[in-house]
Design a protein with these regions (language model features):
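N-terminal alpha/beta PP-like core and its mobile active-site loop of ThDP/TPP-dependent enzymes
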Residues: 2-204
Length: 204
């Protein structure tokens, strides 16, 4: 079995930063946490995306929401596990009611502790249920190899009608795992709603 060289591998955090930059993301709003440092360190290393820190997660989500509305493009927000994600929830409801395309990247405890109520730092039982209540849809990245497919699905969902905020949970241990470098990620696939011709004729 042939092993890949270090130059062809990168952390999931680096893959996330690279993917977002490749699809045109130039700014991310958020709050720095020990749980999202692998992603934010990668953003700083690559230097292709500006990170705008907020004093609280609600403010970060408001900024991401406003950015999405004004720019008519994807707003991206990054928060931390549990309380951090919860702090963004109220502002995310505002984005949901406005139909603003926001990607909410939040984190999760290591997979061995997820959904087990073991008291891991920042862990909140049923975090996914909370996020589903304030999101158009919610994804969870279980494996490093799904990093690009998960990001593509989440960004496409946010930008496809009806637009709205989409949450993506990424466990801390997954962020540190290694994956093959993939460059030049394609733009998100936007699913367009085609009107029914007969219905249009009836209305006309």
């Amino acid at each position: 079995m042939t092993q890949q060289s270090d130059s062809t591998l990168e952390t999931v955090g680096d893959a996330i930063a690279r993917h977002l930059a490749d699809i045109g993301v130039t700014v991310i709003f958020g709050v720095i946490s020990i749980h999202n440092m692998p992603i934010l360190d990668a953003i700083a290393r690559q230097g292709r995306i500006r990170f705008v820190p907020a004093r609280g997660e609600a403010g970060a989500m408001n900024m991401g929401d406003a950015y999405a509305r004004v720019s008519r493009s994807l707003g991206v927000v990054i928060t931390s596990t549990g309380t951090g994600a919860g702090n963004a929830a109220g502002a995310q409801v505002e984005a949901l009611t406005a139909g603003a395309p926001v990607l909410h990247i939040t984190t999760q405890v290591d997979r061995q502790f997820m959904d087990r109520d073991r008291g891991a730092i920042h862990d909140v039982p049923r975090q996914s249920d909370m996020l589903k209540a304030v999101s158009k849809t919610c994804f969870r990245m279980w494996e490093a190899r799904s990093v690009h497919s998960a990001l593509s699905a989440a960004t496409s969902a946010a930008l496809s009608a009806p637009k709205g905020p989409v949450s993506l949970e990424i466990p801390v241990d997954v962020q540190r795992e290694m994956v093959a470098v993939q460059t030049n990620q394609p733009a998100p696939r936007i699913v367009r709603i085609e009107p029914d011709a007969d219905a249009l004729n009836t209305l006309a």
